[in-house]
């Protein structure tokens, strides 16, 4: 699997911003089939930083209604990546 297929997008929420500032931990949406080792290698290769830890969880999609039609958003996988002390990704600065 290509490293750019593993990492889909950053998750920018109030909680993820606090984790970034306090624990040097970033949150990404990743491919559901990717494991922790693949995620760590992809982050290290794309952003050129040292990864200490990867934690993952599967987020269930919400049920949404539009009139009588009931639908469901897709499930997705979230990865919380802890970087080495002193390592930062400039992409997230100012967010």
From Swiss-Prot:
| UniProt key word Magnesium | no
Q: What InterPro entries does this protein map onto?
A: Nucleotide-bd_a/b_plait_sf, Ribosomal_uL23-like, Ribosomal_uL23/eL15/eS24_sf
Q: Provide the alphabetized UniProt keywords.
A: Ribonucleoprotein, Ribosomal protein, RNA-binding, rRNA-binding
In the record, biological process GO terms are:
translation
Pfam families registered for this protein in UniProt = Ribosomal_L23
Is the Methyltransferase keyword given for this protein?
Answer: no
What this protein is reported to do is described as: One of the early assembly proteins it binds 23S rRNA. One of the proteins that surrounds the polypeptide exit tunnel on the outside of the ribosome. Forms the main docking site for trigger factor binding to the ribosome.
The record's subunit annotation is:
Part of the 50S ribosomal subunit. Contacts protein L29, and trigger factor when it is bound to the ribosome.
**Family according to the record:** Belongs to the universal ribosomal protein uL23 family.
Name the record gives this protein: Large ribosomal subunit protein uL23
């Amino acid at each position: 699997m290509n490293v750019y297929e593993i990492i889909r997008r950053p998750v920018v929420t109030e909680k993820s911003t606090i984790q970034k500032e306090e624990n040097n931990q970033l949150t990404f949406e990743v491919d559901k089939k990717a494991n922790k080792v693949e995620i760590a290698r992809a982050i290290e290769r794309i952003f050129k930083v040292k990864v200490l830890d990867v934690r993952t969880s599967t987020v269930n999609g919400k049920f949404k209604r539009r009139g009588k039609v009931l639908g469901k958003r897709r499930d997705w996988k979230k990865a919380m990546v802890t970087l080495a002390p002193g390592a930062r990704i400039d992409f997230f600065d100012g967010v």
